């Protein structure tokens, strides 16, 4: 069995779900992972993505739509751009949330905070001409 540090994509999601995040929440270099549940904009099917996150206040979390610095945004970002009502799972806590792109005023500080936990985001931004967005996931009532 591989360690959570080696996990990517579907195997990461599977282990996270099977263990309520006991295996998969803690990842590389002290980063923590949440699961983002979106509705596929074309298929309508549930999509689940493991993402590095950081808390933003009491009831919100931030993630970065980097896709490794490619010129195309990740599918999960396109999905939530079409349907911002999502679900988030942090360890065993799964809850509804509303996704929004950080405002121009918020972006610099939130970007700085995210690069503190994953410095590679700065390299990703240098690789692309698109502004890599920080996404705020705000907990909502069920």
PLM regions and their residue ranges:
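Hydrophobic secondary-structure block in the mid-to-C-terminal portion of proteins
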Residues: 136-142
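N-terminal short leaders/motifs
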Residues: 1-10, 38-40, 45, 85-94
């Amino acid at each position: 069995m591989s360690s959570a540090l080696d996990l990517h994509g579907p195997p990461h999601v599977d282990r996270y779900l099977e263990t309520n995040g006991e295996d998969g929440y803690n990842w590389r270099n002290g980063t923590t992972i949440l699961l983002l549940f979106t509705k596929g904009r074309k298929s309508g099917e549930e999509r689940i993505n493991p993402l590095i996150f950081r808390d933003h206040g009491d009831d919100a979390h931030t993630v970065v739509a980097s896709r490794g610095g490619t010129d195309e945004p990740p599918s999960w970002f396109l999905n939530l751009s079409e349907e911002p009502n999502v679900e988030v799972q942090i360890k065993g806590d799964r809850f509804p949330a509303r996704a929004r792109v950080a405002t121009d005023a918020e972006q610099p500080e939130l970007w700085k905070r995210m690069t503190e936990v994953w410095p590679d985001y700065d390299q990703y931004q240098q690789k692309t001409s698109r502004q890599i967005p920080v996404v705020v996931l705000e907990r909502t009532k069920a």
